[in-house]
Amino acid sequence: MSQKKSFQGLILTLQEFWAAQGCVILQPYDMEVGAGTFHPATTLRALGPKPWKAAYVQPSRRPKDGRYGENPNRLQHYYQFQVILKPNPPNLQELYLASLAAIGVDLKLHDIRFVEDDWESPTLGAWGLGWECWCDGMEVSQFTYFQQVAGFECAPVAGELTYGLERLAMYVQGVENVYDLDFNGAEGPDRITYGDVFLQAEQEYSRHNFEAADTAMLFRQFTDAEAACRSYLAAGAPDAEGARHRMAQPAYDQCIKASHVFNLLDARGVISVTERQSYILRVRELAKACGAAWLKTAAGGAP
């Protein structure tokens, strides 16, 4: 298989494509997140008036989606390629299609469809008008026009593209099982598959997420993260009229932490339906407070 069609080659091509469009190519955020949207380069930078273009790979964790490595396309740990463009360019769809062509998808031979699917993140207090992109009947990407993040209206509106890298690679390579994906494009004994890299981790983390994660410790961690977030927001609050907030990002880290701990508790099955909504609201309140703090920083547009 050509290097370009390998899993890592796909990532490199997307990075090169979006760098050519003026995006800063960032690295994954160094915290456990449920989706690429949680990266502050998207959530926080979508707020405020300042222009922003960025692209990055983000490992994402959804503990409840683990299947002990036995499901061919369902994972508790997977990769997204995220693009955020603010203000939203008028040719976002054309840029997206050009990126598919760059990774080797022949747009004339394949059935490319956009299916309306508005996006919402209850924990981030965010929503947007969106479409899923289907290639020959398989969803491979989503693009969204952010209307609101952390409870604040997005002005200007930002355009966001999310590529599901495993699904996209399965489509490009024509494989039915994610663990059969060619990871590095090498031949013979040097060939590495997705399963070689991640199958054992999927098996082990599924056991952790469903069976072994210490729930008493997780409840404490949630409370600690919630308290730390509020403490940092208070400590960084402006001390004079017109001053800037000084700790929006450390506080947001704790919001991310609380969200992931909640997802682990949810996977362990120790949160009831009514409690679940309460926890979502608690994380949302943290996200809103962090968004308000961000808007009082230089990057958030404060004078």
UniProtKB/Swiss-Prot annotation:
<keyword id="KW-0547">Nucleotide-binding</keyword>
<dbReference type="InterPro" id="IPR006194">
    <property type="entry name" value="Gly-tRNA-synth_heterodimer"/>
</dbReference>
<comment type="similarity">
    <text>Belongs to the class-II aminoacyl-tRNA synthetase family.</text>
</comment>
<dbReference type="GO" id="GO:0006426">
    <property type="term" value="P:glycyl-tRNA aminoacylation"/>
</dbReference>
<keyword id="KW-0648">Protein biosynthesis</keyword>
<keyword id="KW-0067">ATP-binding</keyword>
<dbReference type="InterPro" id="IPR045864">
    <property type="entry name" value="aa-tRNA-synth_II/BPL/LPL"/>
</dbReference>
<dbReference type="GO" id="GO:0005524">
    <property type="term" value="F:ATP binding"/>
</dbReference>
<dbReference type="GO" id="GO:0004820">
    <property type="term" value="F:glycine-tRNA ligase activity"/>
</dbReference>
<protein>
    <recommendedName>
        <fullName>Glycine--tRNA ligase alpha subunit</fullName>
        <ecNumber>6.1.1.14</ecNumber>
    </recommendedName>
</protein>
<dbReference type="Pfam" id="PF02091">
    <property type="entry name" value="tRNA-synt_2e"/>
</dbReference>
<keyword id="KW-0030">Aminoacyl-tRNA synthetase</keyword>
<comment type="subunit">
    <text>Tetramer of two alpha and two beta subunits.</text>
</comment>
<keyword id="KW-0436">Ligase</keyword>
<keyword id="KW-0963">Cytoplasm</keyword>
<dbReference type="GO" id="GO:0005829">
    <property type="term" value="C:cytosol"/>
</dbReference>
<dbReference type="InterPro" id="IPR002310">
    <property type="entry name" value="Gly-tRNA_ligase_asu"/>
</dbReference>
